[in-house]
Amino acid sequence: MVRKKLWVMQNKAIFYCGTNGSGKSTLRSFNQDAVQIVIDSDHIAMQINPQNPRLADIDAGRKAIGLFHFAIKQHIGFPMESTLSGNSIIQRMKTAKENGFYVHLNYIGINRVEINLARIKARVKSGGHFIAEDIVKYRY
């Protein structure tokens, strides 16, 4: 019971991790009421360059990191997505915990890379962002 009260009282840092096309954004969409701001570098990239968001990945990543630091400093709950392809997300989890956030990790695993590729293809057809097949396979 005490643990549940902490979950309600503490700011939440919810991390959605998994390979590209695994459903991180889909899962996150079900938990929108649990956070105050959303840190989504893919969405930021789409805002910067709607025609080719991949060209804006570096700028979007910087803006996402800026939002992360803002959320930590202001004690604002947030979700963040990652493919876990680097160590920086682990450091962000530690930083959030050290700053009093309740850190929750959701890992979405898919048992075949073909499913990820099909999901990405469907996402692109509906206006979502593209990720190159070789990158998806490498991260898988």
Curated annotation (Swiss-Prot):
Superkingdom: Bacteria
Chain sites annotated for binding ATP: 18-25
UniProt keywords, alphabetically: ATP-binding, Nucleotide-binding
Any Pfam family the entry gives: Zeta_toxin
MF (Gene Ontology): ATP binding; kinase activity
InterPro entries: P-loop_NTPase, Zeta_toxin_domain
Protein's name in the database: Uncharacterized protein HI_1395
Organism: Haemophilus influenzae (strain ATCC 51907 / DSM 11121 / KW20 / Rd)
